[in-house]
């Protein structure tokens, strides 16, 4: 099955929510664990243990594992394995972006079948040009994995750059969308885009997009499940809303309750 087919099956079975695994210090505190590798593993794997059957996908943020060095990366490997065993998809949030052999190296790290950190999909940055990401696109197609390219992110700092006008008159975000739409024709729809759910005006039109839309910003950043329709309009069926702190920030015992509160809000 292609990534797009696996994602569609997961959404049909479990709904379209993606749970972010962001074991930041405040979350470790809420769970009552130490700021060490053991605490990291308790939180990260505990999220999947409790919610593994209740979400289509999980998005571990690599930045919270990397400070612990090799031991933290080993925890991340186990978390990715847990997600797969739970029958959900893993979207590893690494936001990599480079050119040539360097981008090919990043692709091998996350998209090769035998990679220790192999994930169903990853996030990448197009700042060096969408074309610079082709090594990742090609390997993802060969291994039936997915890619989510940043276009209009949920943080307010990105607006000046991402809504800036290109020589064609389109915004930078729209330019990224248009390039991905064209590439998706030959890449089996595996190329997705990151569009923040926090914006009243995206500064781009995703209605003609032919891939998945990863939509961070639901919950703690202010967006709600109910507000997605007004943000994405005709593209709503493509949206994979992502929430993290709103769900995981109350400790293990509150995980399922907070998940339901988010979905009903």
Predicted regions mapped to residue ranges:
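A C-terminal functional module that forms or caps the active site or interfaces directly
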Residues: 193-242, 246
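Acidic (Asp/Glu)-rich catalytic clusters
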Residues: 11-12, 48-54, 80-85, 137-143, ...
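Active-site-adjacent beta->alpha loops and helix N-cap segments on the catalytic face
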Residues: 67-82, 99-105, 128-141, 198-206, ...
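Conserved N-terminal beta1-alpha1 strand-loop-helix module at the mouth
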Residues: 1-91, 168, 256-264
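C-terminal functional extensions of proteins
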Residues: 221, 238-265
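Conserved anion-binding
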Residues: 13, 23, 94-192
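Conserved, mostly hydrophobic/aromatic
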Residues: 19, 58, 93, 122, ...
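Short, well-ordered coil/turn segments that N-cap beta-strands
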Residues: 13-17, 53-56, 86-88, 118-120, ...
């Amino acid at each position: 099955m292609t990534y797009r087919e696996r994602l569609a099956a997961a959404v049909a079975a479990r709904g379209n929510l993606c749970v972010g695994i962001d074991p930041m210090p405040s979350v470790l505190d809420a769970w009552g664990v130490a700021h060490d590798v053991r605490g990291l593993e308790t939180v990260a794997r505990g999220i999947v243990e409790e919610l593994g059957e209740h979400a289509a996908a999980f998005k571990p943020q690599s930045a919270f594992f990397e400070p612990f060095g090799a031991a933290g990366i080993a925890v991340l490997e186990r978390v990715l394995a847990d997600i797969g065993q739970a029958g959900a998809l893993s979207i590893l949030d690494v936001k990599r972006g480079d050119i040539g052999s360097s981008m090919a190296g990043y692709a091998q790290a996350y998209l090769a079948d035998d990679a220790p950190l192999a994930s169903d999909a990853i996030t990448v940055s197009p700042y060096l040009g969408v074309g610079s990401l082709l090594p990742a696109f090609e390997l993802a197609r060969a291994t039936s994995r997915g890619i989510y390219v940043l276009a209009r992110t949920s943080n307010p700092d990105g607006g000046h750059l991402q809504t800036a006008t290109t020589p064609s008159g389109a915004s930078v975000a729209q330019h990224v969308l248009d390039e991905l739409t064209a590439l998706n024709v030959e890449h089996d729809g595996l190329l997705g885009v990151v569009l923040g759910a926090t914006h009243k005006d995206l500064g781009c039109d995703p209605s003609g997009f032919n891939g998945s839309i990863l939509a961070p910003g639901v919950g703690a950043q202010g967006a709600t499940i109910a507000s997605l329709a007004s943000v994405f309009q005709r593209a709503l069926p493509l949206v994979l809303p992502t929430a993290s702190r709103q769900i995981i920030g109350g400790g293990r015992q509150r995980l399922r309750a907070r998940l339901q509160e988010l979905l009903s809000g």
